[in-house]
């Protein structure tokens, strides 16, 4: 199924048009995506390992993805979590952390404080091949070892003190 994204300008004003995922953007066009950081009662973060055939394959990241045309970022976050790790969350559980503007997209980053048992997680094997809970120090070590997607690492360093 093809995905379509709403197009925004540099000020995140909707431009009353959509683009098919994979089609080229014009200068000054942006789309919106979301990312969710799960933190359990031990303070550990849930990360997933990207499928080897994807861009940055084998590296670790937080769950997230593109916001489909007509969706809010909260709706997209709930959908992406269900699709990628099989966990049901509610919009009310999302704590907005930050809006990050990068290259040609805006990323809304959410925090969810939730204990999720390993047996509750069902990975979309086309997207992710593994998951684990890591402490912030373990995540920092993984970043130093270049095991984490670079843009994810940058956002983590920018926001880690808010957790």
Feature map (PLM): residue ranges:
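A glycine-rich, hydrophobic loop/mini-helix early in the fold
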Residues: 33-64
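Nudix hydrolase/Nudix homology domain
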Residues: 57-58, 69, 96-163
């Amino acid at each position: 199924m093809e995905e379509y994204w709403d197009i925004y300008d540099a000020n995140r004003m909707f431009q009353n048009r959509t683009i098919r995922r994979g089609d080229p953007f014009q200068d000054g066009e942006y789309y919106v995506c979301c990312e969710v950081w799960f933190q359990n009662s031990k303070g550990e973060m849930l990360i997933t390992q990207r499928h080897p055939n994807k861009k940055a394959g084998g590296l670790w990241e937080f769950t997230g993805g593109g916001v489909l045309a007509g969706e809010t970022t909260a709706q997209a976050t709930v959908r992406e979590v269900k699709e990628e790790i099989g966990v049901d969350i509610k919009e009310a559980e999302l704590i907005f952390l930050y809006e990050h503007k990068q290259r040609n997209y805006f990323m809304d980053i959410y925090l969810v404080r939730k204990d999720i048992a390993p047996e509750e997680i069902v990975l979309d094997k086309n997207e992710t091949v593994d998951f684990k809970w890591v402490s912030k120090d373990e995540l920092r070590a993984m970043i130093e070892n270049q095991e984490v997607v670079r843009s994810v690492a940058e956002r983590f360093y920018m926001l880690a003190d808010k957790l």
